[in-house]
Curated annotation (Swiss-Prot):
Organism from which the protein derives: Actinobacillus pleuropneumoniae serotype 3 (strain JL03)
Record text on subunit structure and interactions: Monomer.
Residue numbers binding Zn(2+) 2: D57, H58, D127, H165
Protein name: Hydroxyacylglutathione hydrolase
Classification via InterPro entries: Clx_II_MBL (IPR035680), Glyoxalase_II_hydrolase (IPR050110), HAGH_C (IPR032282), Hydroxyacylglutathione_Hdrlase (IPR017782), Metallo-B-lactamas (IPR001279), RibonucZ/Hydroxyglut_hydro (IPR036866)
Required co-factors: Zn(2+)
Length: 235
């Protein structure tokens, strides 16, 4: 079993630290300072970095980390080739911490965005899926992002999902506006408000939970997904 910890960074980012024993893998380091502090505090060995896409709030920590760890294995799609020395393609399989890690095509937010699924248990999805929401489609390729969400929906419902941003409360306000009232939505919103009032993360979430409260996962076709995304962009 892995120990997975969110490292808060910037205004609302989470850098995920995946730990096994004294080794750690870092996902999307937006800032090197909190990563290095976490490693030092817990006396860990940094063994690899996973990058989901090329936005600066997911990669700005890379120059400093590579200067400290020049031999580090860095996995990512071609769009992060300036940092990654192990370029991944959709449906590649990696072995990390004795887990089979599947690389899932997740384009739309960026052209080559990927997600990493550890053994049908843990999904690190960058900016594709958030609790109660999904990422903006900066490429304009709504089909690609809709398809990515369909791939996620096909996973086991117990999969834990680790998005890269704390957007839950604002996303749930939108969900409340567009979905029929439900006990699940009310309870999850109440829980999220309590957690944030204590400055605690609302993440990870689960696929089971998101299927109940995420309007983008409930979109039945591409047209409905596009309409929802446009609504959210102007919400």
């Amino acid at each position: 079993m892995l120990n997975i910890t969110p490292i808060p960074a910037l205004s609302d980012n989470y850098i995920w630290a995946i730990q096994k024993d004294n080794d750690v893998i870092i996902v999307d380091p937006s800032d090197a300072v909190p990563v290095l502090a976490f490693i030092a505090k817990n006396q860990l060995n940094l063994t690899a970095i996973l990058l989901t896409h090329n936005h600066h709030d997911h990669t700005d920590g890379m120059p400093e980390l590579l200067s400290r760890y020049p031999q580090l294995s860095v996995y990512g799609p071609q769009e992060v080739a300036q940092f990654a020395n192990r370029i991944v393609q959709p449906e590649d399989h990696l072995t990390l911490f004795d887990y089979d890690v599947r690389v899932i095509e997740s384009a739309g937010h960026t052209a080559q965005h990927v997600s990493y699924l550890f053994g049908n248990e843990y999904l690190f999805c960058g900016d594709v899926l958030f609790s109660g929401g999904c990422g903006r489609v900066f490429t304009g390729n709504y089909q690609a992002q809709f398809d990515a969400l369909q791939r996620f929906k096909a996973l086991p419902e117990f999969v834990e999902i680790f998005p890269a941003h704390e957007y839950t409360l604002s996303n749930l306000k939108f969900a409340e506006a567009v979905l029929a009232p439900s006990c699940a939505l009310f309870e999850i919103q109440e829980r999220a408000e309590i957690l944030r009032s204590r400055n605690q993360p609302t993440l990870p979430t689960t696929l089971e939970r998101e299927l109940q409260i995420n309007p983008f996962l409930q979109a039945v076709d591409l047209d409905q997904f596009i309409a929802l995304r446009h609504q959210k962009d102007n919400f």
